[in-house]
Amino acid sequence: MPSVAAAIIAGGPARRLGGATKPLLEIGGQAVADRQLAVLRPIFSRLLVVAGDPAPWRARGVEVVPDRVTGAGPLAGISAALAAASDQEAVVCLAGDLPFLSPALLTALRDRAPEAEALAPRPAGRAEPLCARYAVRARATVDARLDGGRLALHELLAELGTVWLDDQTLAALDPGGLSFFNLNTPDDLRRAEEIARRAP
């Protein structure tokens, strides 16, 4: 089995959520970060968090990596994760505001198409670059785009010749389709609370 780490790209303050740090928002009485780590720990032997402030993560026992370039968005987080995990074959990079990750989807991202430079879901034709696996050998491409100010993740996936997980595959791995539900607005937070209340 290939050696694959997982990295939470924590991101900066969320302007539309009052400047909150998204992974520390509570859903169903539990921080999003703790929900994510509970799902990730049984699947990945190495976990990283790319974050500007290491303090909230120390108590969670996670290796914290600083962004390589500040103000460059999630591409800088992916670059930092690949650099920190140079002893691995790949890194599954995840946005820090995904509270309902499917273990089956994460396992598929770890294991499938190990030769691919990138493996990413594409539900309804829409790529999900922050719930995707990137080969460590793709770091040169990532860094060249970062250094050149070409920060769009969808363009990165196109350049890498990504292997895609299509709708049929995703329906089997994540029947509820909630893995890509993220937190951008107060309405998203309210809906997430409703989903958490309904969860078994």
Stretch-by-stretch model annotation:
Residues 187:
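Conserved active-site and cofactor/substrate-binding residues in soluble primary-metabolism enzymes
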